[in-house]
């Protein structure tokens, strides 16, 4: 069994189909099919149930996926260990909430990359649930999420304190009236949905139309145009507030607080690049 076989198996398990895995790996589909079949013959067990809807893991496949995740992470860490010489260097895979990536992180990472030019930084965005799953599967080294998160295997550093507000194109209006407009969410999943449901319940506003968008810019533009209202961090609204028709409205005190934490696996091999990242985060004015 080679590491390449495990990467292919991991991709098929995550994507749920041969074609999607082949596309993500830039392989031809027949090659992926053959490698999975060879792996099953080698292990003398079925790893996937094959249906018209795609591929799902058998119990044996689920066990192998856990081992494959760890083995591939160990290989990744071995590569980083071999590169650990001199100044911080090598790959650093970071995930972030889109609002944090737009508002809090540009200056921080500009200074970090200037100080450590040999580090190969990659920054991807997503919602808290997706980013946590990427961390648990060793697909990211660390991520900025709404915290705290309840996973024993994760280390967490509180880095930013935020205030949740309601963004609208109306300067004035009661919270109850504003909440009767359509609510604009991130399409990938909104980390505040439970809190928003509680706000609607508190204000006696029935659930109504939801419109989903893919980016923060799109949500801000839609709010300005009067398409609806959106629950966003105050810093994100202020970041765009030089634009016309964009106003923030305070929420009841019990719904305002938001904490952004930086999370990573407890057993992650801490390269000098990662340690310097942690040191920088802990030194931030809002850090702890």
From Swiss-Prot:
Record-annotated DNA-binding residue ranges: 18-37
Record-annotated HTH lysR-type domain positions: 1-58
Organism, as annotated: Bacillus velezensis (strain DSM 23117 / BGSC 10A6 / LMG 26770 / FZB42) (Bacillus amyloliquefaciens subsp. plantarum)
Family according to the record: Belongs to the LysR transcriptional regulatory family.
Protein name, entry field: HTH-type transcriptional regulator YofA
Recorded superkingdom: Bacteria
Function: Regulates expression of the cell division protein ftsW, and is essential for cell viability during stationary phase.
Cellular localisation: Cytoplasm
Gene Ontology CC annotations of this record: cytoplasm
UniProt gene name: yofA
InterPro entries: LysR_subst-bd, Tscrpt_reg_HTH_LysR, WH-like_DNA-bd_sf, WH_DNA-bd_sf
Keyword annotations from UniProtKB, A to Z: Cell cycle, Cell division, Cytoplasm, DNA-binding, Septation, Transcription, Transcription regulation
């Amino acid at each position: 069994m080679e590491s390449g076989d495990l990467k292919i198996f991991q991709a098929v398990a995550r994507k749920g189909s041969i074609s999607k895995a082949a596309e993500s790996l830039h392989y031809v589909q027949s090659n992926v099919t053959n490698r999975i079949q060879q792996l099953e013959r080698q292990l003398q067990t079925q790893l996937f149930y094959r249906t018209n809807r795609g591929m799902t893991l058998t119990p044996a496949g689920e066990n192998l996926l856990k081992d494959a995740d760890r083995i591939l992470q160990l290989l990744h860490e071995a590569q980083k260990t071999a590169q650990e010489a001199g100044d911080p260097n090598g790959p650093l895979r970071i995930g972030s909430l889109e609002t944090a990536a737009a508002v809090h992180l540009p200056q921080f990472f500009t200074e970090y990359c200037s100080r450590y030019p040999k580090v190969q930084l990659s920054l991807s965005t997503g919602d808290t649930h997706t980013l946590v799953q990427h961390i648990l599967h060793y697909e990211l080294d660390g991520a900025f999420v709404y915290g705290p998160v309840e996973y024993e295997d994760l280390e967490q550093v509180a880095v930013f304190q935020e205030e949740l507000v309601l963004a609208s194109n109306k300067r004035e209006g009661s919270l109850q009236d504003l909440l009767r407009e359509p609510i604009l969410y991130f399409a990938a999943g909104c980390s505040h949905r439970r809190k928003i449901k509680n706000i609607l319940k508190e204000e006696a506003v029935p659930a109504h139309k939801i419109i989903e968008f893919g980016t923060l810019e799109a949500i801000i533009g839609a709010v300005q145009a009067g398409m609806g209202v959106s629950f966003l961090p105050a810093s994100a609204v202020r970041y765009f507030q030089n634009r016309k028709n964009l106003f923030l409205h305070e929420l009841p005190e019990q719904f305002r607080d938001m904490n952004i934490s930086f999370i990573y696996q407890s057993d992650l091999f801490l390269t000098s690049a990662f340690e310097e990242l942690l040191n920088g985060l802990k030194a931030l004015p809002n850090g702890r």
